[in-house]
């Protein structure tokens, strides 16, 4: 990749690119596709042609693999500017508090695929705001995160906090802080009793191996677990995130 394109991100995967083309075609600077995708993305090609942006039918899958660094391109690769994740501000938290918003907080989730899966679940259940930790252990947006999100990236807004601990301190008094912890006493089934229908809340999801940091855990107003049969200790964080998104959405129905 030359210097001109170093700050681009390759969005690949059929559903991810389809949602990007439908919701934010203006973000696409270049588009590459296999022959079997030409008819499906005809409108996008017309859009790009009108704006004198590059689109091209590739001759082999290897070209797409080289562009996105993955064999899982599903016949399409759209290049966009590297997304800017805005820093969280107190005014965002205050707005969520006044509007009774449900938010997710990712505390050092290290796997980009898990981040993408969490974003997909959030979009599915109508949770539009996700805060990620700015620490090195936190996964960032990658082609695989976009692909695994299956188009969900176009329906959420990401924010970055210095750490989960820093965010939870700022959120005190504005959002009910609920930590996902497999050692907690209370069950996810209690969320309707914990969160009011119009109450603003943040669900804290922790690192795949270590969970929520001890400092962040101490700042949670309540810790909640997903009870199982005991055969394994816990669910994958993306699976757990899906259940928590569902529980929070159910409260608001």
Each model region followed by its residue ranges:
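N-terminal positively charged helical leader segments and presequences
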Residues: 1-93
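Short acidic-hydrophobic, aromatic-tinged amphipathic segments that line or gate anion-handling sites
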Residues: 11, 55-59, 156-167, 224
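Structured adenosyl-cofactor binding patch, chiefly the S-adenosyl-L-methionine
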Residues: 18, 124, 144-149, 213-253
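RNA substrate-binding interface of SAM-dependent RNA methyltransferases
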Residues: 19, 26, 33, 93-185
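Short, acidic/turn-prone active-site loops that include or flank metal/cofactor-
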Residues: 36, 61, 135-137, 208-209, ...
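Short beta->alpha connector loops at strand-helix junctions that form conserved
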Residues: 59, 107, 133-134, 162, ...
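Short, hinge-like loop/turn segments at secondary-structure boundaries
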Residues: 73-76, 147-151, 194-198
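Active-site/ligand-binding-proximal alpha/beta "capping" segment
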Residues: 177-232, 236
């Amino acid at each position: 990749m030359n210097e001109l394109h170093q700050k681009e991100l390759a969005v690949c995967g059929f559903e991810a690119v389809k949602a990007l083309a439908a919701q934010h075609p203006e973000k696409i600077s270049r588009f590459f596709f296999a022959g079997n995708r030409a008819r499906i993305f005809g409108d996008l090609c017309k859009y790009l042609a009108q704006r004198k942006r590059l689109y091209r039918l590739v001759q082999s899958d290897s070209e797409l693999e080289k562009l996105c660094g993955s064999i899982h391109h599903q016949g399409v690769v759209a290049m966009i500017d590297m997304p800017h994740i805005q820093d969280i501000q107190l005014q965002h938290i205050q707005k969520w508090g006044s509007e009774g918003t449900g938010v997710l907080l990712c505390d050092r989730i290290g796997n980009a695929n898990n981040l993408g899966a969490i974003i997909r679940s959030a979009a599915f259940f109508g949770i539009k705001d996700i805060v990620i930790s700015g620490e090195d252990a936190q996964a960032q947006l990658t082609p695989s995160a976009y692909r695994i999100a299956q188009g969900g990236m176009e329906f959420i807004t990401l924010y970055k906090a210095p750490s989960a601990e820093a965010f939870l301190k700022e959120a005190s008094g504005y959002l009910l802080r609920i930590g996902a912890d497999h050692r907690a006493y209370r069950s996810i089934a209690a969320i309707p009793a914990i969160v009011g229908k119009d109450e603003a809340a943040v669900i804290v999801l922790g690192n795949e191996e270590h969970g929520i940091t001890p400092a962040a855990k101490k700042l949670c107003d309540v810790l909640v677990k997903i009870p199982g049969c005991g055969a394994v200790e816990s669910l994958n964080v993306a699976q757990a995130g899906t259940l928590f998104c569902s529980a929070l959405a159910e409260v608001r129905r």
